[in-house]
């Protein structure tokens, strides 16, 4: 067949030219880098591998919400880099178990426990508290920080409130039980005050190194338990200062050999002037404006390292200790410069360098560690490696406040992680953190946690509704439903939200915006479901399943879901070997359908008793098992299996509150009874007898039993007589009251 004329002009047929779509520019992950104070494109040094060092805790007390602020936030960042952006993250964290705070706390705890075991007499305790109070008053007068001063004043007032009752009980010769009770109260209230005094007096005599390892070992264990409870991933490598002393000594030696350190009186200091004047280096990269801040520098050196003799060892006030010569009462290790221990800043440099080498991608820590700790880390490490890029990206988590107030261990207003987990679940705490920027201040308050709880409920209800829709019976082909405009619109919104979430994660891992986009997607999905149900139509199963699986996967990436469930939060805890929902739900579905059939017959026959039983099953019995039936007119009952642990926890909380009220009431009644008994015992003493038993104070008395001479036979001064007369007159009144009570028959 002959070709048409037009076709003949084209010659041999070929494919037309093709050009790719213009598309959009792909976003790249940017992180806020403290080294530039700007968001920078994140580019690891070695392909997709990311080396990361995180400053761990100084383990001398319970982990608090300030710790949670850093470690949950870094856990979220780590998971997102690993599981969303698909980086190969190698994460190293340290444990500081050699530190001035640990040494001081260990000595104080040890000496106080020894003091308690020795069981001082009430008189001796009163005398010791008096002596310790003098030292404490000096400490108070030298304190300029208003918050810390307020805390010290509270301690002082508490001690005085406990001191006077014991003194009065001893003077009045109250029953031994009452004196013992007052003795224990004063001992407990004066613990901080006595510990300081005992440390100043006997601290240098604590020489057993093993004593200094017990405290950090215990608190490290508690820290790891807290992190596990918060679902914080363990580090790939954990380094302890006590296990890296040889590496630290070698690290310090090389810094000295490179000309950036000097030995002074057995200690080794970093020469900030020499380092800063080098063309290859810069000192205080993170907070250059803080150079010369002696208060911050001294806090970095530690309480045991800022005495006048220590400070005189430095060439410059800005220099800091790499190695500290140990004094009596401090743990020590051998070194080329004599017995000593590592400085705080050098510990991280040596351990991070040992594991990650001369340059790492990310270094993380709390905002308050920027200067001097991290600036000094940078200086030491770059002096050791003779480079200018020890850390490529420095990430600092924001502060944590408690209901708008500063949180500090020294102020004793911190909430421990265990305390927080008594009130809220690990997921709720994590959601609260996700709802805030990782680098900004987070206010831990009832409002913050209520927002997290409501978000969790909002998401969970959506997941439960979708699961109910997916359980509706259908054949194989029935799962593929025709798409109308509503499905097309929801699907478009779904992909728009996914794109917005990606943009937010690329923008300094903005989880706050991500959660809002997820909330918006759920709201759109809920509107779609409601519209379908209103029209008596079945929502598109596959579309809702895709949306739910995506949201679940994002929450898994954030560490808010641990289970392998495809959709939603796990039911019945996170460590179940079986899937409770898939096992139980078929039976609940049968029960629901049977109940609906019974209700239908009861309505037709107007059997109200059966309807009441049906409602009782829904409202009273099934909630006890963590099951919720939701009845909708004209539609099948929605069956939801909720977390049983949550219900049990709510009950336990209510029970605890009731028990606490009962305990306080009983305690108040007991105290009142004891006070009345003590008062009655005091009232029974005739005024002419009250001083006669005090032979250790007085030798002569007048006809009324009033003392006139002391034990040495000297007449009492007018001042002494005036003071005793007041006590005598007070006792006269009390005794008269007692006699009146006897007369009235009301005294026992």
From Swiss-Prot:
Annotated residues that bind ATP are located at 409
InterPro entries in the record = Cys-tRNA-ligase, Cys-tRNA/MSH_ligase, Rossmann-like_a/b/a_fold, tRNA-synt_1_cat_dom, tRNAsynth_Ia_anticodon-bd
This protein's cofactor list reads: Zn(2+)
So which domain of life are we looking at?
Eukaryota
Tell me where it resides. Answer: Cytoplasm
From the UniProt entry, list the residue stretches annotated as the region Disordered: 1-25, 656-719
Residues binding Zn(2+): 55, 348, 373, 377
List of residues binding L-cysteine: 56, 96, 373
* Keyword terms of this UniProt record: Aminoacyl-tRNA synthetase, ATP-binding, Cytoplasm, Ligase, Metal-binding, Nucleotide-binding, Protein biosynthesis, Zinc
Q: Which Pfam families match?
A: tRNA-synt_1e
Q: Where is this motif: 'KMSKS' region?
A: 406-410
- Bias (Basic and acidic residues) occurs at 656-679, 686-717
Its catalytic activity?
tRNA(Cys) + L-cysteine + ATP = L-cysteinyl-tRNA(Cys) + AMP + diphosphate
* Annotated HAMAP family: Cys_tRNA_synth
Q: What does this protein do?
A: Catalyzes the ATP-dependent ligation of cysteine to tRNA(Cys).
What's the name of the protein? Cysteine--tRNA ligase, cytoplasmic
The lineage is:
Eukaryota, Metazoa, Chordata, Craniata, Vertebrata
State the encoding gene: CARS1
């Amino acid at each position: 067949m002959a070709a048409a004329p037009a076709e003949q002009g084209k010659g041999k047929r070929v494919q037309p030219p093709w050009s790719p779509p213009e598309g959009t520019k792909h976003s790249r992950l940017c992180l806020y880098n403290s080294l530039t104070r700007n968001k920078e494109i994140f580019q690891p040094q070695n392909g997709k591998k990311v080396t990361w060092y995180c400053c761990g805790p100084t383990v001398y007390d319970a982990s608090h919400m300030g710790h949670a602020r850093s470690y949950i936030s870094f856990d979220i960042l780590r998971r997102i880099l690993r599981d969303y952006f698909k980086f190969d993250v190698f994460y190293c964290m340290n444990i500081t178990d050699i530190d001035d705070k640990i040494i001081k706390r260990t000595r104080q705890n040890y000496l106080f426990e020894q003091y308690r075991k020795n069981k001082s007499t009430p008189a001796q305790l009163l005398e010791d508290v008096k002596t310790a109070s003098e030292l404490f008053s000096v400490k108070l007068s030298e304190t300029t920080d208003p918050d810390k001063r307020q805390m010290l004043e509270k301690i002082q007032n508490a001690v005085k409130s406990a001191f006077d009752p014991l003194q009065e009980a001893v003077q009045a010769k109250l029953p031994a039980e009452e004196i013992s009770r007052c003795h224990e109260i004063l001992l407990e209230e004066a613990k901080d005050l006595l510990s300081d005094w005992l440390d100043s007096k006997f601290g240098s005599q604590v020489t057993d190194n093993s004593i200094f390892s017990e405290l950090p070992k215990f608190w490290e264990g508690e820290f790891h338990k807290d992190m596990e409870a918060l679902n914080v991933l363990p580090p790939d490598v954990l380094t302890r200062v006590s296990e890296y002393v040889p590496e630290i000594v070698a690290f310090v030696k090389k810094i000295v050999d490179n000309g950036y350190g000097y030995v002074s009186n057995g200690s080794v200091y970093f020469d900030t002037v020499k380092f800063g004047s080098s063309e290859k280096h810069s000192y205080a990269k993170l907070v250059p404006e803080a150079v010369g801040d002696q208060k911050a520098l001294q806090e970095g050196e530690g309480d045991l390292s800022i005495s006048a003799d220590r400070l005189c060892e430095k060439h410059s006030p800005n220099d800091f200790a790499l190695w500290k010569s140990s004094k009596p009462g401090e743990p020590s290790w051998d070194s080329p410069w004599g017995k000593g221990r590592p400085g705080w800043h050098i510990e991280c440099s040596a351990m991070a360098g040992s594991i990650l080498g001369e340059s790492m991608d990310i270094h993380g820590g709390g905002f308050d560690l920027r200067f001097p700790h991290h600036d000094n880390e940078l200086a030491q490490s770059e002096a050791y490696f003779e480079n200018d890029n020890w850390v490529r990206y420095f990430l600092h988590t924001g502060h944590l406040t408690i209901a708008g107030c500063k949180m500090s261990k020294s102020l004793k207003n911190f909430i421990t992680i265990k305390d927080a987990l008594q009130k809220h679940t690990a997921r709720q705490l994590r959601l609260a953190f996700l709802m805030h920027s990782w680098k900004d201040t987070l206010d831990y308050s009832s409002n913050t946690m209520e927002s997290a709880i409501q978000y969790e409920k909002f998401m969970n209800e959506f997941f439960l509704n979708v699961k109910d829709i997916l359980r509706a019976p259908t054949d194989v082909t029935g799962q593929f439903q025709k798409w109308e405009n509503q499905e097309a619109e929801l699907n478009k919104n779904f992909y728009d939200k996914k794109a917005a979430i990606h943009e937010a994660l690329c923008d300094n891992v903005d989880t706050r915006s991500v959660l809002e986009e997820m909330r918006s997607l759920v709201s759109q999905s809920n509107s779609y479901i409601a519209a379908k149900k209103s029209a008596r139509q079945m929502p598109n199963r596959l579309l809702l399943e895709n949306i739910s699986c995506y949201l679940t996967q994002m929450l898994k990436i954030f560490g808010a879901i641990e289970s392998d469930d495809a959709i939603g939060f796990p039911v019945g805890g996170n460590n179940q070997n079986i899937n409770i929902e898939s096992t139980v739900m078929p039976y609940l579905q049968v029960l629901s359908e049977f109940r609906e059939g019974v209700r239908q017959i009861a309505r037709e026959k107007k059997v109200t008793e059966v309807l009441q039983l049906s409602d009782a099953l829904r409202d009273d019995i099934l909630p006890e098992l963590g099951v919720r039936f939701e009845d909708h007119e004209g539609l099948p009952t929605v069956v939801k299996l909720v977390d049983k642990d949550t219900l049990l926890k709510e009950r336990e909380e209510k029970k605890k509150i009731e028990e606490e009220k009962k305990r306080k009431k009983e305690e108040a009644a007991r105290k009142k009874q004891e006070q009345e008994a003590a008062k009655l015992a005091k009232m029974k003493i005739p005024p002419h007898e009250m001083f006669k038993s005090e032979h250790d104070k007085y030798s002569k008395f007048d006809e009324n039993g009033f003392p006139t001479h002391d034990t040495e036979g000297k007449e009492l001064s007018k001042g002494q007589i005036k003071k005793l007369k007041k006590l005598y007159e007070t006792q006269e009144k009390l005794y008269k009251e007692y006699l009146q009570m006897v007369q009235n028959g009301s005294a026992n």
